Every structure is written in C-alpha cells, then in structure tokens.
C-alpha cells in the first residue's frame, strides 16, 4: 500500500519544467523544430519526432475543464486533505494543453461552489527540495 506522498521522478527531458515550478514559474515544452507545444514534457516530439525542445513560460491563468472530489481519498496519504478537489485545467495560452492539479482555496464546507468554466490561477505547493507541484486557486 502507498502510504507516502507519490513524488514524480525527474528525467532529463522534464528537468527544466520542475526547476521552473520550484521557482514558481509554469512553463510548457515546445518542439525545437516544428514549435508544437506539448504537455506533459517528453523526449521526442509526437508530430515531427525531433528530440530538440525549448520552453515557454506561461501566465498561469487557466479555465476549469473538469474536476473530481474523490470520496474517500484515493490514497491513505491524502486522508488529512479530504475532501479535496482535483481539477483538469486548460491553459489560456494553449487550448489543447490541460494540466491536473489540486484546487486549494475552496473551503471544505463549500466544495459545491466550484464549477466547470471557473477561472483559475496557478500556485505552487513545495513538496521537497526539488519538487513544487502546480496547484490551482479559484479567482
């Protein structure tokens, strides 16, 4: 059973993403050849198969595309946070890129106030020395 917080592993192709998150910056990987944005970061472009890539910082503004309130929590480690909202958000700069993260500023007694289409802003939750996870605040 998983009883500790699951931490993403850092790979060579997503190291800059995690470094930027630790600096409270959200960035999206682009192909260095065809300039196609992609998320999650990966080693090779799915469009042209180039291994070249660049990074573009984004505003952190997003729209709630979907969400779930897991009941009971998915893992025992999340018991203290329960109930909580996990959102699938669409970045304003990229209508085809969606990220998953916890929505952190909704009181537990008011979880029903969240709606698809709500405007959100990124925030970052420091997990350890290397990892800060993007999470979301309702505007």
What is each residue range found by the language model?
Residues 62-64, 103:
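Conserved hydrophobic positions within beta-strands
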Residues 67-73, 94, 108, 127:
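Short, conserved beta-turn/loop elements at beta-strand boundaries and strand-helix junctions
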Residues 39, 53-54:
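Short functional micro-motifs and their immediate structural scaffolds
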Residues 30-33, 47-50:
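Short, cysteine/histidine-rich loop/knuckle motifs that typically chelate Zn2+
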Residues 25-28, 42:
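Residues immediately within or flanking Cys/His clusters that coordinate Zn2+
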Residues 100-139:
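Well-ordered alpha/beta subsegment
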Residues 88-101:
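Short, basic/aromatic beta-hairpin or loop at an interaction surface
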Residues 74-88, 131-133:
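Short aromatic-glycine-enriched beta-strand elements
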């Amino acid at each position: 059973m998983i009883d500790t917080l699951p931490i993403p592993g850092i790979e060579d192709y997503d190291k800059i993403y995690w470094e930027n998150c630790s600096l409270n910056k959200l960035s999206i990987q682009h192909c260095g050849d065809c300039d196609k944005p992609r998320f999650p970061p990966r080693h090779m472009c799915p469009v042209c198969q180039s291994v070249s890539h660049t990074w573009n910082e984004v505003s952190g503004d997003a729209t709630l595309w979907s969400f779930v309130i897991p009941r009971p929590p998915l893992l025992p480690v999340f018991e203290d946070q329960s109930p909580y909202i996990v959102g699938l958000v669409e970045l304003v700069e990229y209508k085809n890129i969606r990220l998953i993260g916890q929505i952190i500023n909704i009181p537990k007694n008011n979880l029903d106030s969240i709606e698809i289409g709500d405007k959100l802003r990124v925030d970052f939750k420091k997990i350890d020395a290397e990892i800060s996870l993007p999470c979301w605040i309702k505007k």
